[in-house]
Regions:
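Aromatic-lined, polymer-binding surfaces characteristic
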Residues: 34-56, 62-210
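Low-complexity, Ser/Thr/Pro/Gly-enriched N-terminal "stalk/linker" regions
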Residues: 1-51, 63-65
Length: 210
């Protein structure tokens, strides 16, 4: 009997293998029948593929090239007319899963010059959020610094701001995802998601001592 870790890896490979056919060659995602696709889906797919590669070192699933598909997903997400914070943040972490710098990144090598420029521009975009959306700024800052697109690392400052908001909105140090709503706070799964996402970003940061 496989240990729990191996079972989880087998399950992940099975799920990815069952869904990888939904990724088109241009990086767009085919929606499930009778459903509509979301603008952020290519970015989510890029991160799923990147994490599988990071965990296994594999570059193929069921004969499909993970590197090429991730590059296609990132290209689709980056060049999409509809800008989505989460799609870009997820695709950024998917990119970093293939290497901590652009000199050693299999996917970066596949991106066109136009996509690289658009990615740099969109990673620089910032909105000051009061809720869980702030974690996407953290991921974008990690990607921008790690890929050498900026010499200034804003990661620490953005994490501090995220934690300051928790202090401001909850005396119990709980993550309130709707602080502007008055006394009715929202303490749901997004609090856990936020800390997991930040941890993921720091794991992929070029500066492992941050």
């Amino acid at each position: 009997m496989l240990n729990f870790s191996a079972q989880c890896m087998d399950m992940a490979q099975s799920i990815l293998g069952g869904n990888i056919g939904a990724i088109n060659q241009d990086g767009s995602i085919v929606p499930v029948e009778n459903e509509s696709s979301f603008d952020c889906e290519p970015g989510h797919a890029a991160m799923a593929l990147g994490e599988f590669h990071r965990a296994t070192g594999l570059t193929e699933i069921d004969g499909k090239n993970i590197v090429d598909l991730t590059a296609a997903c990132i290209t689709a997400q980056t060049n999409d007319k509809e800008y989505t914070e989460d799609g870009l943040a997820y695709s950024s972490l998917g990119l970093l899963a293939f290497g901590p710098s652009k000199e050693r990144n299999l996917v970066w090598e596949k991106l066109s010059e136009e996509t690289r420029k658009n990615l740099d521009k969109r990673l620089l975009s910032r909105s000051d959020y009061e809720d869980h959306l702030q974690i996407f700024n953290i991921a974008k800052a990690v990607a921008r610094f790690s890929m050498g697109l900026s010499k200034k690392d804003e990661t620490g400052k953005l994490i501090d701001k995220f934690l300051e908001r928790i202090d401001q909105t909850s005396r119990g140090k709980y993550f309130d995802d709707k602080p502007a709503s008055g006394i009715d706070g929202v303490f749901d799964i997004y609090g856990i998601v936020s800390f997991v996402f930040i941890r993921q970003s720091l794991q992929l940061h070029a500066n492992m001592h941050l």
